[in-house]
From Swiss-Prot:
This is Large envelope protein. It comes from the Viruses. Glycans are attached at residue 212. Residues 1-10 are annotated as: Pre-S1. Isoform M is N-glycosylated by host at the pre-S2 region. Myristoylated. Residues 11-70 are annotated as: Pre-S2. Residues 1-70 are annotated as: Pre-S. Its main location: virion. One of its GO terms (cellular component) is viral envelope.
Length: 292
């Protein structure tokens, strides 16, 4: 029979081959429809004439992805540096105050600080130094007053350093009080174009006029510092070599400064016996960095 001699002509195989033909035809039809919708890559497209739509579609919101509420690495580094600074202040400020108290007391006794007898009408204390009086000693209130003044001076120095740093970075308004009359001041930064990027210290520009700004004067503090720097440069020309170093130090972040102070405070005395042989090499590298 035919199904024994020609098994490929059976109904089952015919159905299988017919199904394959239908699938191939469907794929071909889908490909042609895709080319009709998006264009055949092998055909030349005619230029499209731009038209203006009468209806405005809302702008799409594109840009950087939203920041996750989790803490970023820089924030974590800042938190760790802040904790180190707090620990540093908590452990070292009493020692600093005691050393400054010792120096202050030694000014009154050039021959050496005598011992405090600690005699009191109510309490009898042992002999001790005037910089470490117990609460039962009469000199405790004076020691406490000296320490309080020292703490105020240290706090004032830190505040001045912070204000100078913020002013140098341009984060403080250089003219906090608005003048009564608006005058055009020829600031060094304000004579540039409005589109240019200003370098600190910033001028307080009220409004741009003809490429310049109507400014307020730069504060006297920065002007005095600039005058002193120009005066020093006029008499000591070698200070020009320090300008790249100062610019580099000014670009360091506040966190890096705290970490540097932390390392110098703890490892500085131990490194004094190691660094002297390498100082000429450091000077040579600095000269190469400046001149090359």
């Amino acid at each position: 029979p035919l199904r024994d001699t020609h098994p490929h002509l059976t109904m089952k195989n015919q159905t299988f081959h017919l199904q394959g033909f239908v699938d191939g035809l469907r794929d071909l039809t889908t490909t042609e429809r895709h080319h009709n919708a998006y264009g055949d890559p092998f055909t030349t497209l005619s230029p499209v004439v731009p038209t203006v739509s009468t209806t405005l579609s809302p702008p799409s919101t594109t840009g950087d992805p939203a920041l996750s509420p989790e803490m970023s690495p820089s924030s974590l580094l800042g938190l760790l540096a802040g904790l180190q600074v707090v620990y540093f202040l908590w452990t070292k400020i009493p020692t600093i105050a005691q050393n400054l108290d010792w120096w202050w007391t030694s000014l009154s006794f050039p021959g050496g600080i005598p011992e405090c007898t600690g005699q009191n009408s109510q309490f009898q204390t042992c002999k001790h130094l005037p910089t470490s009086c117990p609460p039962t000693c009469n000199g405790f209130r004076w020691m406490y007053l000296r320490r309080f003044i020292i703490y105020l001076l240290v706090l004032l120095l830190c505040l001045i350093f912070l204000l100078v740093l913020l002013d140098w970075k341009g984060l403080l308004p250089v003219c906090p009080l608005q003048p009564t009359t608006e005058t055009t001041v020829n600031c060094r930064q304000c004579t540039l174009s409005v589109q240019d990027t200003y370098t600190p210290p910033y001028c307080c520009c009220l409004k741009p006029t003809a490429g310049n700004c109507t400014c307020w004067p730069i504060p006297s503090s920065w002007a005095l510092g600039n005058y002193l720097w120009e005066w020093a440069l006029a008499r000591f020309s070698w200070l020009n070599l320090l300008v790249p170093l100062l610019q580099w130090l000014g670009g360091i972040s506040l966190i890096a400064w705290f970490l540097l102070i932390w390392m110098i405070w703890f490892w500085g005395p131990a490194l004094l016996s190691i660094l002297p042989p390498f100082i000429p090499i450091f000077v040579l590298f600095f000269l190469i960095w400046v001149y090359i």
